[in-house]
């Protein structure tokens, strides 16, 4: 259900942007999915296609890019990737992070010094990286 809510927000944003730009058609949408969010791109794509039906975005190409999650320890400065520590997360933890990414601090610590005081450098959240539109008379 979380993916449908994300898809709805993306679709509303795309259509608002298209309207502001006086677009006659939305040709493509590029969406970046942060690895930490653990979003199912297939569900988001299906939901977006359903929500685009009957709009100027119907049939638009949907492109997904996954952004790798990277963390930086505020204590020792060490940077690491989620892929390096993923095995420490069980299914329940991954689901908790999926809904509330900030809880990652409760489940992970710096591999070098053990501190839970780290920042998410990238790979968190979902955002629109690009919208390709067509205006009346353009091709």
From Swiss-Prot:
Record-level Gene Ontology MF annotations? nickel cation binding; zinc ion binding
- The residues listed in the UniProt record as binding Zn(2+), with positions renumbered to this chain, are 73, 76, 110, 113
Supply the alphabetized keyword list.
Metal-binding, Nickel, Zinc
Matching InterPro entries: Hydgase_Ni_incorp_HypA/HybF_CS, HypA/HybF
GO biological process terms, alphabetically, are: protein maturation; protein modification process
Matching entries from Pfam families are given as: HypA (PF01155)
Residues involved in Ni(2+) binding: 2
| Family stated for the protein in its record | Belongs to the HypA/HybF family.
Question: Tell me, what does this protein do in biology?
Answer: Involved in the maturation of [NiFe] hydrogenases. Required for nickel insertion into the metal center of the hydrogenase.
Q: Which HAMAP family match?
A: HypA_HybF
For this entry, the protein name equals Hydrogenase maturation factor HypA
| UniProt source species | Pyrococcus horikoshii (strain ATCC 700860 / DSM 12428 / JCM 9974 / NBRC 100139 / OT-3)
Lineage per the UniProt record: Archaea, Methanobacteriati, Methanobacteriota, Thermococci, Thermococcales
Gene coding for it: hypA
